[in-house]
From Swiss-Prot:
DNA-binding region (UniProt annotation): 391-410
Name this protein carries in UniProt: RNA polymerase sigma-54 factor
Entry's Gene Ontology molecular function annotations: DNA binding; DNA-binding transcription activator activity; nucleotidyltransferase activity; sigma factor activity
Alphabetical keyword list: DNA-binding, DNA-directed RNA polymerase, Nucleotidyltransferase, Sigma factor, Transcription, Transcription regulation, Transferase
GO CC terms of this entry: DNA-directed RNA polymerase complex
Keyword Nucleotidyltransferase: yes
Sequence motif RPON box, location on chain: 480-488
InterPro entries tied to this protein: RNA_pol_sigma_54, RNA_pol_sigma_54_core-bd, RNA_pol_sigma_54_DNA-bd, RpoN_core-bd_sf
Top-level division of the source organism's lineage: Bacteria
Organism: Azorhizobium caulinodans (strain ATCC 43989 / DSM 5975 / JCM 20966 / LMG 6465 / NBRC 14845 / NCIMB 13405 / ORS 571)
Described purpose of this protein according to its UniProt entry: Sigma factors are initiation factors that promote the attachment of RNA polymerase to specific initiation sites and are then released. This sigma factor is responsible for the expression of the nitrogen fixation genes.
UniProt similarity note: Belongs to the sigma-54 factor family.
Residue ranges of the region described as Disordered: 52-91, 114-133, 493-514
A GO biological-process term: DNA-templated transcription initiation
Amino acid sequence: MAMSPKMEFRQSQSLVMTPQLMQAIKLLQLSNLELVAYVEAELERNPLLERASEPESPEHDPPNPQEEAPTPPDSGAPVSGDWMESDMGSSREAIETRLDTDLGNVFPDDAPAERIGAGSGSGSSIEWGSGGDRGEDYNPEAFLAAETTLADHLEAQLSVAEPDPARRLIGLNLIGLIDETGYFSGDLDAVAEQLGATHDQVADVLRVIQSFEPSGVGARSLSECLALQLRDKDRCDPAMQALLDNLELLARHDRNALKRICGVDAEDLADMIGEIRRLDPKPGLAYGGGVVHPLVPDVFVREGSDGSWIVELNSETLPRVLVNQTYHATVAKAARSAEEKTFLADCLQSASWLTRSLDQRARTILKVASEIVRQQDAFLVHGVRHLRPLNLRTVADAIGMHESTVSRVTSNKYISTPRGVLEMKFFFSSSIASSGGGEAHAAEAVRHRIKSLIEAESADDVLSDDTLVQKLKDDGIDIARRTVAKYRESMNIPSSVQRRREKQALRSDAAAAG
């Protein structure tokens, strides 16, 4: 059969991800901080979008000039602002007397002063402002001292300790390689090669930096950091150095090996360990840490007067934007070219979709949160031990949504409950079968039970993983030993052997102190 080109029509249906749908899906999974940043960017990009302003309170209403105007005196003195115009030629003291206020404490000592220039005649010309340059509004934050970073603190000490420009240049490069915790994370040979210096020169400058405050800064390891702090206290003797060289034994609480290596008895070893515990393993964190964002819940859950749970959105985390229809009508009349009309139409469509997407996002979050609260009512009342097994499909089926939508909604979202501020993902937990064939247990509740059992153990009766399995079975929880070990390790709880050593060491310390 000969092949020949031909045309034919075919009708079919398919799902297409439009830009608007992609935008709505993206908004669902954003955290409240990411959402604010996204909306701010849209406000900058789209001229038809504007913030929905809050109604002004009565105290912010503009004053009534008739009510504010003072009663003119009978002596024929100038009224309204005439007194200022007539007194511009007088001295500053006269103006301060007329104002009946002290201008000396309006700003802090380092704030910009009033600009006083030479005027005509014998008077002075005073340019009154709000305290900021160019007549800007007074901003108290402008007078706050800038936070001193660790690098700033070290560079200030370097300028005093190293007058030689070449050594100071080496020091500045080394300080740039010290992280926020105070540790030197660079390579001395690489710095020496970059600056054309010798390894000994760079190492010598690093030793100078290690003598700066905070004590322990510039160390290349934990043992060196602790040793620097102990040297400043003149407490780094050979026995203490031997202990610092074997911190892994200290982490395993192997005190018998430490006593043998350090050549000390149990009492001296306990004193040495106590001294190490009083040191700062991250000395740099005292200076200018990174910005810490507060954890702001997206949903509030509180108990109503009738015993039911009230679920509310946190309005502070919801950006409010509007489409400026008045401005759109104005610029639409002025649009002439096809390009301008297309741009305006795209802006209007994008703005409308954004406002609808924000509204839909808020409704979806509230719907999902309400169902989570309904499913986990026992947890809110009684605590973690009553957390139910819950998966995305259960919530999705209950509210008539796809489980991928529920997954996006619960990402990076937090609920404020009587049990604390919790991530929405916390409420979704896999199930552990019941040994008696009853209701399954949530994995998070089982973790909490394991932690409670371990916290209640004594030094003479440390629970092994096998013992934990048996105790959980007595509570009706059918769980394997490897699962107990996995849950224990996920909570950073050491093994029974290590816990026994730790508890015995603590008991020895208490006996020595007594």
